[in-house]
């Protein structure tokens, strides 16, 4: 599947708005591949996006789903109380700290029914029975992993491809189990190290993800054993991305460091530092998606007000190097940069 791409670049699934059928289509037209983000969407909305993407891009697309985790028993009441002042600032109340499975079963049924060409999973490995259902429908199954242990689990369950995520990545870390004793939720492996270590454990094709915004980055991951590179942050400012105006303005302005935090969702995720992140990270428990539901009204109100200080501004470490413009142009530039990087490296070795 990914080995045959004319340009080995994949538009990563970015839940919450940035991933759109138009973004996927633009990347596909440039020779790459694109994912829709099923996370946080209803099955009906996802069905509409699948239909539209198929009309525009044919079969060169996939859908990403979040694997439901074990229900956390952590009491999130005190965290909700802590945020009342922040919520008052925007004239809203904190949301209910409920657990849910993001409509996983309905969305899994949908991608099987629609025979989506590729389905990727984040936050764990789906049940073997679910993978078998997908295979029976002709679906290629991708599991996102961060460590060799996770890679072995995914391979044993029947995954066809592993998406290897380095700690440089923007958005949620894909760790299978969120280790509450660690601010990062688990071991922090850089992308190239993770590719080498996981590549030594399996013969499955590897897709590289994590802080990739330049063609030289893409070339480096291919040299480290990946068959393609998956980029999210690089496309956040693309014309076709659904990145909201407040989010775009913060990316355009630059000047902020990135940090990993549980403050917004209860799961470790990398984003631009802002007031909410600084003031609440230390107090945020490992309770996903309860915290995501608690903070949702605050994030929505801050976004509507154009205030980036209480919005989850997910982005990888290298976000200052991103550019705006059509996604096709971004992919073409990545390809040219990769070719130049390979040629320059070859010259260094005579």
Model-derived segments and their meaning:
Residues 1-201, 334:
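Active-site entrance/lid segments in N-terminal catalytic domains of soluble metabolic enzymes
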């Amino acid at each position: 599947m990914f080995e045959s791409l004319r340009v080995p670049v994949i538009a990563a699934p970015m839940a919450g708005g940035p991933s759109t059928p138009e973004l996927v289509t633009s990347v596909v037209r440039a020779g790459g591949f694109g994912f829709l983000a099923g996370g946080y969407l209803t099955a009906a909305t996802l069905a509409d996006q699948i239909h539209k993407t198929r009309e525009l891009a044919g079969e060169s697309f996939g859908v990403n789903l979040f694997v439901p985790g074990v229900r956390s028993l952590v009491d999130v009441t005190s965290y909700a109380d802590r945020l009342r002042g922040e919520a008052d600032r925007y004239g809203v109340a904190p949301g209910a700290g409920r657990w849910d499975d993001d409509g996983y079963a309905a969305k899994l049924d949908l991608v099987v029914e629609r025979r989506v060409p590729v389905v990727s999973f984040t936050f764990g490995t789906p049940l073997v029975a679910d993978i078998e259902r997908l295979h029976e429908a002709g679906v290629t199954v991708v599991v996102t992993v961060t460590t060799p242990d996770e890679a072995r689990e995914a391979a044993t369950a029947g995954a066809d491809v592993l998406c290897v995520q380095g700690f440089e990545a923007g958005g949620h870390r894909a760790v299978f189990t969120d280790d509450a004793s660690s601010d990062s939720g688990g071991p922090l492996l850089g992308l190239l190290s993770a590719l080498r270590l996981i590549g030594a454990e399996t013969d499955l094709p590897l897709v590289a993800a994590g802080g990739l915004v330049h063609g030289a980055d893409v070339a480096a991951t291919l040299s480290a054993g990946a068959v393609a590179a998956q980029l999210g942050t690089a496309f956040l400012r693309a014309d076709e991305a659904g990145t909201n105006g407040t989010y775009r303005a913060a990316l355009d302005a630059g000047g902020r460091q990135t940090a990993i935090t549980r403050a917004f969702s209860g799961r470790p995720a990398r984003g631009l530092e802002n007031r909410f992140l600084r003031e609440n990270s230390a107090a945020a428990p490992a309770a996903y998606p309860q915290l995501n539901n608690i903070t949702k009204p605050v994030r929505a109100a801050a976004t509507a007000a154009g205030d980036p200080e209480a919005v989850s501004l997910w982005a990888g470490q290298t976000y200052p190097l991103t550019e705006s413009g059509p996604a096709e142009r971004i992919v073409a530039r990545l390809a040219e940069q990769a070719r130049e990087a390979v040629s320059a490296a070859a010259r260094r070795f005579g």
